[in-house]
A protein has these predicted regions:
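Canonical positions in the second alpha-helix
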Residues: 46, 79-80, 113-114
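Alpha-helical segment of the N-proximal tetratricopeptide repeat
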Residues: 16-52, 66
């Protein structure tokens, strides 16, 4: 009797996966080069294919934060926090965004969560 081990256990490679990886690398490069309009477009297109990519959500939120579009930034930070709720960087930028919008209680709530995660975080005291 012949045993075919592993022959049928291979999952097919997603052809879109390689394109997504290339698009993500290009997105990171655009952000590093501070080409934010192009990065926003590419990142938004990327999220249509990979909607729950934590880093892309956070980075797009950060770009909107830099553009003083705090409400839009918060929406991306919230999506990012749905994936990684203990990300201090996301919570901190979200707190700053709420502060800029004069939503002090929401900023305080973010700071409290940061202190729960990292009691020695110095950025919270600056806020």
């Amino acid at each position: 009797m012949i045993v075919l081990v592993g022959l049928f256990s291979r999952t097919p490679k997603d052809p879109q996966s390689k394109k997504n990886d290339e698009q993500f690398k290009k997105f990171k490069k655009l952000v590093k080069e501070k080409k934010y309009p192009e990065a926003l477009k590419l990142g938004t297109d990327y999220l249509e294919k990979v909607p729950n990519h934590h880093d892309v959500l956070f980075t797009i939120g950060g770009i909107y934060y830099l553009k003083n579009k705090f409400r839009i930034a918060i929406s991306y930070f919230d999506k990012s926090l749905n994936i990684g709720s203990y990300d201090i960087d996301v919570l901190l930028l979200k707190a700053y965004s709420h502060q800029k919008l004069e939503e002090n209680q929401r900023a305080i709530d973010c700071c409290k969560k940061i202190q729960e995660i990292d009691p020695k975080n110095k950025s919270v005291s600056d806020l």
